[in-house]
């Protein structure tokens, strides 16, 4: 009897050893178990098993769907650091069914995993299945796969990948955080890319297939190396934050049918330079191009009817915003974006220099309209201006001369202009409410409404021709002897010794400096 039992045991051991050699690795088994999908009543389970071999190979056998585990219930989770290779065995002949799915979180955190074999029977991969597999640089996905869960390869070491032909949707966060990702081959039938699919990935260039018609928010946000993107031809909406914080993005080929540039779409794209918005664009969202520091000029297409606030704020090199002929909602005045009806200043480009004359009829300064205009020095303000919205003049550090055409503004309006204590408020003689030498604590001075603004002429230019020469000595002498008059701007330039008086001492100093060939 004992010999019979021993014989049976040896036979079973031999059969098991033979099975391990034929189906999987010949190495000793570290651990094993069942992993098949339970039915809704937990009364029956798919015939699927797993085993981890001593050499780090994790093997799967059986048929049907793998149980969709939660993060903490993956049976081999405690061995994550030991797993180097995953092999999912296919059928031994075409008549046998086989494994159809890979569970969510199946191999998440397997930092030493370098090789994966997936049979052509698998149709679905669960969310985060290969998340944070830092050593996994390549993987071959069979064309049988029709569906993938969120973040399948998030923060993995993938460098390149070919996506399955049956895949129509690229899920949320598929390649998010894949810092080494270099290239992706897209399937011909791909129609949708969900939010953050490539965010924080290492892509440098990417051309998306024209079959894609929907892309959700933040698809390429925070891709530090991304330089060039060609968007799908039929994409109509560039969603919120799609390229946010892509610091090296230089060139974008927009879809010819694009209608909406979403909020924050190109926020903080530091190297984005000039581009052409398609004529089809109708809406530019809130802060769409905010802080694009290399942008030098932009043209608003004729069909644009909505430009939300701060769309181009903080673009320090932006010299001008142009508007295409025929636009019914907006216009460009001296490179500054305004509403077509002339009642609101929308955006002053960040690199605007010198002087801007706000046209008569303007009633409103939009929020952040003059934000960070460091090169703007003088502003002419019409009597019609009544409203300045939030932070309309933030960080205009060199804007020190304000020329008012109307009555003295109230304290509330001046406060919203964020005027420096070093600034001078110029006003027209006869306009009510003004006081001299100060008004509400600000230094004041007269001007005559001339296009030659006080403070804009070089010292000594008493005739206002933009140059300083002997003619200015003659002109100043004529003024002092009552032979001719000078404007307020010329009078300020004539005060060459800066004592707030124009007299013979200024004439003498001007003559001496010209004779000596020195500047004032």
Task: For the regions a language model picked out, list residue spans one by one.
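Positively charged n-region of N-terminal signal peptides that target proteins for export
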Residues: 1-9
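Bacterial N-terminal signal peptides
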Residues: 9-17
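Cellulosome-associated attachment modules in secreted, modular CAZymes
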Residues: 16-24, 451-520
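Surface-exposed repetitive/solenoidal architectures
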Residues: 25-111, 129-131, 152, 369-372, ...
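Short, solvent-exposed loop/edge segments of extracellular or virion-exposed proteins
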Residues: 36-39, 89, 323-325, 351, ...
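Short, T/G/N/S-enriched strand-turn elements that build extracellular solenoid repeat scaffolds
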Residues: 49-50, 105, 309-310, 356, ...
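Structural signature of tandem-repeat unit edges
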Residues: 57-64, 81-100, 111-124, 134-147, ...
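Consensus positions within tandem repeat domains that build extended binding/scaffold surfaces
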Residues: 103-106, 126-129, 149-152, 171-174, ...
